[in-house]
Amino acid sequence: MTERIVLAYSGGLDTSVAIGWIGEATGAEVIAVAVDVGQGGESLETIRQRALGCGAVEAYVADARDEFANEYAMPTLKANALYQGHYPLVSAISRPVIVKHLVKAAREFGATTVAHGCTGKGNDQVRFEVGIQTLGPDLKCIAPVRDLALTRDKAIAFAEEKGLPIETTKKNPYSIDQNVWGRAVETGYLEDIWNAPTKDIYDYTATPEFPPAPDEVTISFQAGVPVAIDGVKVSPLQAIQELNRRAGAQGVGRIDVVEDRLVGIKSREIYEAPGAMALITAHKHLEDITIEREQARFKATVGQRWAELVYDGQWFSPLKRSLDAFIEDTQKYVSGDIRMVLHGGQAIVNGRRSDTSLYDFDLATYDTGDTFDQSMARGFIELWGMSSKVASGRDLRVEGK
């Protein structure tokens, strides 16, 4: 029986060429797997037909937009996950859902190997292969760009030689990855980290220097998940899409950062994540009034470690599952409404309310009706500073000898 290989297929030049390239290099039949995580562009049927036209014996396509929003974006939101304080894990959280469908397709079509289009110096090769070996430990992995010397120039030449139904061009100098949670742009002109991004780089966001009138929006949450916008019920996918539109129109969610890649190098990245950043901002402000102080402090540490694990391709790891359990427990009271103004590249919260809030007006007010017993403060301060006071006395005693 002829060996079968499933290929993570985007519909672009590199993976279209990879179908024939893999076939010629290995003698295997190739099954193309395309997963829609909200990247937009062509329909799944168009992509399926192109895969078949490029030589795939089968084409597996999946509309995973709701799955991605519910099972991958929402845990990211609950964690307030920003890798190194900036990056909302746009590409990192899409890889596990793609891996899940790659392994599913491999089982369905009897494949023994999974192929992906990643290079040998990026994070995604790790995310794909660690995920595949976790969900399908018997499956082998290959990367045509890394393992079979498939360069961009060779891809163009191969496509033209074989007459493949795909545009061959070098016009776009950037590497772009996008989904409903955001958009990532790298390489080309951006590799000189002194170069400012040019306007043509952006697609999800309008220029914030000339914004339209301020847009006030109220986001309602239930147990950490957005359930309504301005009183209209929404699914997680709809919430992200609506805020991509509204926050994007105001230039919210542009990020220019040099980050530490898993493989040991620093890389300049431009991100656009209007919906994600607006939601994370709103969610964090709701947590500020619904989560107890010590729990909130520890959750911030957990969220940072969670982001590192996911960035590093450990979505399916035992530690990540344990952190998920903690984060989920913190969300049971994170319900209520956040009002924010979207304008000029910023999402500024100006109102919050919750039936499960820990904010007590009578304790917080400085006006008549204050129920806070200020007479307790003196004793509290004495005890709170006791250890520092004792240590200082010791230092003075020892140093004075």
Curated annotation (Swiss-Prot):
Gene Ontology biological-process annotations: argininosuccinate metabolic process; L-arginine biosynthetic process; urea cycle
Positions contributing to L-aspartate binding: T119, N123, D124
Membrane spanning stretches: none
Database matches in Pfam families: Arginosuc_syn_C, Arginosuc_synth
Listed GO CC annotations: cytoplasm
Pathway assigned to this chain's UniProt record: Amino-acid biosynthesis; L-arginine biosynthesis; L-arginine from L-ornithine and carbamoyl phosphate: step 2/3
Reaction equations catalysed: L-citrulline + L-aspartate + ATP = 2-(N(omega)-L-arginino)succinate + AMP + diphosphate + H(+)
Localization per Swiss-Prot or TrEMBL: Cytoplasm
Record EC number: 6.3.4.5
Gene3D superfamilies: Argininosuccinate synthetase, chain A, domain 2, HUPs, Single helix bin
CDD domains in the cross-refs: ASS
Keyword Amino-acid biosynthesis tagged: yes
InterPro entries per the UniProt record, alphabetical: Arginosuc_syn_C, Arginosuc_syn_N, Arginosuc_synth, Arginosuc_synth_CS, Arginosuc_synth_type_1_subfam, AS_cat/multimer_dom_body, Rossmann-like_a/b/a_fold
Top-tier EC class: ligase
Main location: cytoplasm
GO terms assigned for molecular function: argininosuccinate synthase activity; ATP binding
Keywords (A to Z) from UniProt: Amino-acid biosynthesis, Arginine biosynthesis, ATP-binding, Cytoplasm, Ligase, Nucleotide-binding
Highest taxon listed in the record's lineage: Bacteria
Amino acids binding L-citrulline: Y87, N123, R127, S175, E259, Y271
Positions contributing to ATP binding: A8, Y9, S10, G11, G12, L13, D14, T15, S16, G117
Family: Belongs to the argininosuccinate synthase family. Type 1 subfamily.
Subunit structure as annotated in this protein's UniProt entry: Homotetramer.
NCBIfam families tied to this protein: argG, PRK00509.1
Protein name listed in UniProt: Argininosuccinate synthase
Protein species of origin: Pseudarthrobacter chlorophenolicus (strain ATCC 700700 / DSM 12829 / CIP 107037 / JCM 12360 / KCTC 9906 / NCIMB 13794 / A6)
Lineage: Bacteria, Bacillati, Actinomycetota, Actinomycetes, Micrococcales
Gene name linked to the record: argG
